[in-house]
């Protein structure tokens, strides 16, 4: 059912059990939304509709589903774009770069139109949309200057993909996904001025165990294939329990990496303590820390004893072999030893994003050197034309 009531000063509160309650300006509850209900929210306030810490123009449709609550912003394409441009690109960048972003984002949005509940996602899964908070004078000007203009290839809207930075060369679409699009071909990028072009991320053995539990973390990692620009296509990982192969995209998602233009290195840090934990009685830990290479009889290696003081002897060579249940007279089924490796995975990477289509940092550089929005777009999307939108482009 669709709720058809009018309220003023309305506040919506969403509970963890997906229950939605409405409160008036005096904070008095006036209505509960039930499962399968729909609710339309609109306002005459020029500041928009608040959702958490963000404001949105237009209207909001709220849907109560079996497993989720969907909040959909109903807004015209041009108004939507003035927020998208500021969400996707710093508004202090050159106007020609902002205009290129506006045309690419308009094309991308119209290409996605037609989802059963909403047309386009508001995150970087599609393109980022932060509502009125990212709308500025410059973004509105960029959208007005390019009003209705879209990118077409053979009189059809292109899939106008874009990304932050490719680190020198953009990627062919077929080398990242299966589909080949002639206009999404590898071209030179001009993104060397990106201050975050190079990056590095480290993963401890404990983190790797959590990321790859089925194979027991990472003992070895081998890159099986790369693209012409050096992006990882496939890797093989050997863990304590077995091995598995992953695509570069899978690894990027699983490890939350900025891109697939990466290299891996497993290092043994001699200065990093090995850790052995013994869990006793309801997962309460007794933890030992020993520096790799040290003689256990010469150091104090007992820390964080949570239940009992534990006395060990110089004859003990390896804390993982301490017969803790005998010393503390605790049943063996309540004692568990867990050892961790001292290997750390270092991921060194370049660029940010999938690397296909327009590079935003490349667009900025070209704009600072005098390129127009059209020149920027035709560099990154090969063989396209820029035309006012027509229905038959869909």
Q: What do these predicted regions represent?
A:
Residues 86, 90, 106-114, 213, ...:
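Sec-exported extracytoplasmic/periplasmic mature domains
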Residues 278-308, 326, 350:
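Primarily a LysM-type cell-wall glycan-binding module
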Residues 270-287, 329-344:
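Intrinsically disordered, low-complexity Ser/Thr-rich linker and spacer segments
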Residues 76-92, 189-193:
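Acidic/histidine-rich, surface-exposed loop or edge segments in extracytoplasmic proteins
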Residues 5-76:
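A contiguous strand-loop segment
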Residues 96-97, 102, 110-115, 139-147, ...:
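Exported/periplasmic cell-wall-interacting domains
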Residues 93-280:
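Extended substrate/cofactor- or partner-recognition/assembly subdomains adjacent to catalytic sites
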